Amino acid sequence: GEVFWTDFGQHLALRQNLEALLAEDERGRLTRALFNLPEAKDENGNRLVRASIPAGADIRGALIVDAEIRAPETLIHGGIVIGGSYGRIRMPQGGIAMFGTAGELDFDGPHAIAFQPVLPSLRLPEGGRHATVLTQDGPLQLFTNEAITDYRGDAYAQPLEGNPVSFDEAARLVDKTASA
């Protein structure tokens, strides 16, 4: 066999590896097996594992694991939701939401990822990224985009995308919180 290699440290690699969970090829089957996810799908092409979804929601070709979605107005086509509790999710072109608590998630294009969103509502553009970072001073909402591929220099040391702090400062705040 071949070596299975994955890199979750880069935005593009993270997205590609998570989206492999939906793929119907050998890599998709291997990735699902590594995470002990089923091959079987429901009548709408979804893989649902300990998922609570409302009647009437338009969910097709999705993977939903350990998540609750409450709003019947939800639209997920080819999206991934792992962990969390959500009101309405709108992912007409896919996207990934992980470990969040959000009233409304709106993804305006493919490839958006929301990690641990703790917000009443969140809207991401195509390739958008969001993370709620927990610090001693409270949660920080950080944004970036898959189009940004180089986080050296000013891209790391200066706030980007309207963020309240730089990624460098966010890392220091997380370290401070972890060591407290």
Regions found by a protein language model. Give the residues of each.
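Left-handed beta-helix
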Residues: 1-180
